[in-house]
């Protein structure tokens, strides 16, 4: 079971996403279910190590946002074209 700590994004848009990536974080979103979509930011290195395992894409993950646990599955992963970096992940509530 994977547990990921996340923070709610305060800013959105291209410039805000670039600032996140420069700070070794990256944007993500949680959607699905009856709740509203939630824009979050994740630590790049921690998630990069987790996603190296195949189970990251098949198991239910736990994301902790403001002390609240959300069960999700990775739906879509966007990677940098030539660098070994994650650009964005879509999570769907499980």
Curated annotation (Swiss-Prot):
Keyword Ribonucleoprotein: yes
Domain of life: Bacteria
InterPro entries: Rbsml_bL25/Gln-tRNA_synth_N (IPR020056), Ribosomal_bL25/Gln-tRNA_synth (IPR011035), Ribosomal_bL25_short (IPR020055), Ribosomal_L25_dom (IPR029751), Ribosomal_uL5_bac-type (IPR020930)
UniProt cross-references to Gene3D superfamilies, sorted A to Z: Ribosomal Protein L25, Chain P
This protein's GO CC annotations: cytoplasm; cytosol; cytosolic large ribosomal subunit
UniProt entry keywords in alphabetical sequence: Ribonucleoprotein, Ribosomal protein, RNA-binding, rRNA-binding
Alphabetized SUPFAM superfamilies for the sequence: Ribosomal protein L25-like
GO molecular function: 5S rRNA binding; structural constituent of ribosome
BP term (GO), one: cytoplasmic translation
Pfam families: Ribosomal_L25p (PF01386)
Biological role: This is one of the proteins that binds to the 5S RNA in the ribosome where it forms part of the central protuberance. Binds to the 5S rRNA independently of L5 and L18. Not required for binding of the 5S rRNA/L5/L18 subcomplex to 23S rRNA.
Family indicated by similarity: Belongs to the bacterial ribosomal protein bL25 family.
Assembly description: Part of the 50S ribosomal subunit; part of the 5S rRNA/L5/L18/L25 subcomplex. Contacts the 5S rRNA.
Name of the protein in question: Large ribosomal subunit protein bL25
Organism expressing this protein natively: Escherichia coli (strain K12)
Gene: rplY
